[in-house]
Amino acid sequence: MAELKNDRYLRALLKQPVDVTPVWMMRQAGRYLPEYKEVRAQAGDFMSLCRNAELACEVTLQPLRRYDLDAAILFSDILTVPDAMGLGLYFEAGEGPRFERPTDTIDAIKKLCIPDPEDELGYVMRAVSTIRRELNGSVPLIGFSGSPWTLATYMVEGGSSKTFEKIKRMAYAEPAALHMLLDKLADSVVLYLNAQVANGVQSLMIFDSWGGALSHHAYREFSLRYMQKIVDGLTRFADGRKVPVTLFTKGGGLWLESMAETGCDALGLDWTVDIGDARRRVGHKVALQGNMDPSMLYATPERIHQEVDQILASYGEGTGHVFNLGHGIHQHVDPEHAGAFINSVHELSGKYHK
């Protein structure tokens, strides 16, 4: 593998000195870019794009050609794991992801098999190795998975949900069934992420998109417990370097201290958390990623510049900060505004790293 030329992102996650604050964007390869839309149309549908290693590589690299980003993130989807378990993933116009065979009974859960990442998910591994080769050491490659709780919400609900009624009914009326599902998912995610590392990813992120829907105690029982199991099972060294792990619970500001106890290297923050306060709470244990409101990218470049300056000032001096949005970039954002955001981070952050 080519030697890494820009390791700013990895260094910040490990709280090592950097010259400027590194920056990347969740969903940086996506629908806000006209060049992405062209490749998406060529692929035919979203999962066909994910399953084609060359096209997945192309859309992963597109934002790096436009912007001075400090990391690439594998183009894929969190629902690849349940899809590989045989649930029949499809996307319905205006409705988002759906499953033909939801896992909403104990019998359905018992029948689930843990997928082989080099077989049922081999297309993801081919994409990883292709992207890593094409990056040629320019920036690190981030791999990822959904958290067991978040994957389970889609599997039990049969798709997206605003109320999470079915999975919460299972959590409180049939907790043993849900724990069986979460356990299988945690085992699957460990294998999946370790295979990503073996094929070339240099950092890992676990997206707990729906952890914030849980009550204070239920979060620990049904979400954090299984992210802990994953962290404990991950390959943490490859290519002679540590492979940093970031946990991100959207709406998880209540639980930063508990999340930091898992042994992860960094926590992602959504935009509802003050990053300076988060640093005071857990900055002695973990690095922090975030956390500008993605909707701020609809503002003028001047206003974006001000917001970046405010977040950098709130975090303060020193390393341990990876700048990002507090969630994925919106599809209708002007690409020029995304560029203004990235340039502002590099331009304004140097003074915090003297």
Curated annotation (Swiss-Prot):
| Residues flagged as site, Transition state stabilizer | D77
Pathway info? Porphyrin-containing compound metabolism; protoporphyrin-IX biosynthesis; coproporphyrinogen-III from 5-aminolevulinate: step 4/4
Molecular function via GO: uroporphyrinogen decarboxylase activity
An example GO CC term for this entry is: cytosol
Q: Which PROSITE patterns match?
A: UROD_1, UROD_2
CDD domains per the UniProt record, alphabetical = URO-D
What binding partners and quaternary form does the record give?
Homodimer.
Q: Is Hydrolase one of the keywords UniProt gives this record?
A: no
Which keywords belong to this entry?
A: Cytoplasm, Decarboxylase, Lyase, Porphyrin biosynthesis
Explain the purpose of this protein: Catalyzes the decarboxylation of four acetate groups of uroporphyrinogen-III to yield coproporphyrinogen-III.
According to UniProt, the name of this protein is Uroporphyrinogen decarboxylase
| Gene giving rise to this polypeptide | hemE
